[in-house]
Amino acid sequence: MDKRVAEVAGAIVEAVRKILLDKRVTEAEYRAGVDYLTEVAQTRETALLLDVFLNSTIIEGKAQRSRTSAPAIQGPYFLEGAPVVEGVLKTYDTDDHKPLIIRGTVRSDTGELLAGAVIDVWHSTPDGLYSGIHDNIPVDYYRGKLVTDSQGNYRVRTTMPVPYQIPYEGPTGRLLGHLGSHTWRPAHVHFKVRKDGFEPLTTQYYFEGGKWVDDDCCHGVTPDLITPETIEDGVRVMTLDFVIEREQAEQRKSATETVA
């Protein structure tokens, strides 16, 4: 028996049983729920459904235990093979969207500036799409890896992302509609910060005053993830100083034993 599985899964089952009784769920309603979950699986929306309603809660718990910059949901559009870039993310020449500069530092949780940290950056096109995922957009557009310099600094120029809808024609979108919600996410930029010997940080940041910032369908926005509206020479600037924490000794030991 797996004690952790028994603890968590058992608590979930008991909570659901209590809701079924408290809300006097009928046999017909129960069967409708079974049919709904079957449809979710058949349309391959299981991950989408869980991410929309529950992922932010997992991140909230992680943030309460962390000494790092605020973590956030990763989303489905991270790709490991993004190229290393220096100063500029590739964007289409036809883009008429606003430029964006992202800059800052990476530090340890004890304040040490970290050279050689790798920062994956990815965000939507001005059409709300993602490279390597949608419409045959090349994987080296609108995403890339940055490497911090000897002083822990990084800087990259790109274009402003836009709000976009999650898949809305399937069962997840339908459930959001039943709940009186919508399927829009606010404009945001994703980051994954990594360095050997440190815990990876996955997060995303939003824009002050942006549409849907106060009503994200995935409940992923918290106040510390909203960047102020800073304009320099007519260009929006996002300044982010990331803090990552060292791996714990027991985690390093576990990883070594797994490899062995």
UniProtKB/Swiss-Prot annotation:
PROSITE patterns: INTRADIOL_DIOXYGENAS (PS00083). It catalyses: 3-chlorocatechol + O2 = (2E,4Z)-2-chloromuconate + 2 H(+); 3,5-dichlorocatechol + O2 = (2E,4E)-2,4-dichloromuconate + 2 H(+). Its EC number is 1.13.11.-. Its cofactor is Fe(3+). Keywords: Aromatic hydrocarbons catabolism, Dioxygenase, Iron, Metal-binding, Oxidoreductase, Plasmid. This is Chlorocatechol 1,2-dioxygenase. Binds 1 Fe(3+) ion per subunit. Preferentially converts 3-chlorocatechol and 3,5-dichlorocatechol as opposed to other chlorinated catechols. Retains diminished activity toward non-chlorinated substrates. It comes from Pseudomonas putida (Arthrobacter siderocapsulatus). GO terms for molecular function: catechol 1,2-dioxygenase activity; ferric iron binding.
